[in-house]
């Protein structure tokens, strides 16, 4: 796991793992797992993300709009746009392949990711 958080009060329960593509230099594919009826944190970052839903049901907030998610659906998150994902299924994890350009963006900007995420337990990291 490269990142995760759990906060019962905010209904946050998720983890992020790096998908294995050893030759990838600028793309950084990740598997996001969100527990049933839970969220990941509302956050933003410098890298772009393309979400492909592997399994489960939910919705993703991109800016001001909630968009439905189901297996096979795609969602795009532009740079520096506030976003959050919600698993709406009562029993099944929501699993998403997130393809990002984090490798390229972090090479240009340095390690900016920790400044834009919520600390464990729900306190802002930055």
Describe the predicted segments one by one.
Residues 48, 67, 83:
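Glycine-centered loop/turn positions within well-structured domains
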Residues 13-17, 28-44, 79:
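Conserved short histidine dyad/triad with adjacent acidic residue
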Residues 1-26, 111-126:
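A short, N-terminal "cap"/entry segment at the start of jelly-roll beta-barrel domains
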Residues 31-35, 44-62, 99-102:
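Short, conserved beta-strand element in jelly-roll/cupin
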Residues 40-42, 60-61, 77, 83-90:
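Short beta-strand His + acidic residue motifs that chelate non-heme Fe in jelly-roll/DSBH
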Residues 64-80:
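Short acidic-glycine-tyrosine-enriched beta hairpin
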Residues 76, 91-110:
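A short hydrophobic beta-strand segment most commonly corresponding to one strand
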């Amino acid at each position: 796991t490269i990142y995760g958080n759990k906060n019962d009060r905010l209904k946050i329960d998720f983890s992020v793992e790096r998908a294995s593509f050893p030759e990838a230099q600028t793309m950084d594919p990740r598997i996001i797992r969100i527990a049933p009826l839970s969220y990941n944190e509302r956050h933003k970052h410098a890298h772009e993300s393309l979400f492909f839903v592997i399994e489960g049901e939910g919705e993703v907030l991109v800016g001001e709009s909630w968009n439905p998610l189901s297996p096979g659906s795609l969602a795009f998150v532009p740079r520096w746009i506030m976003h959050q994902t919600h698993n709406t299924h009562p029993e099944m994890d929501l699993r998403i392949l997130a393809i990002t350009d984090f490798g390229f963006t972090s090479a240009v900007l340095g390690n900016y990711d920790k400044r834009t995420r919520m600390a464990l337990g729900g306190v802002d990291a930055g």
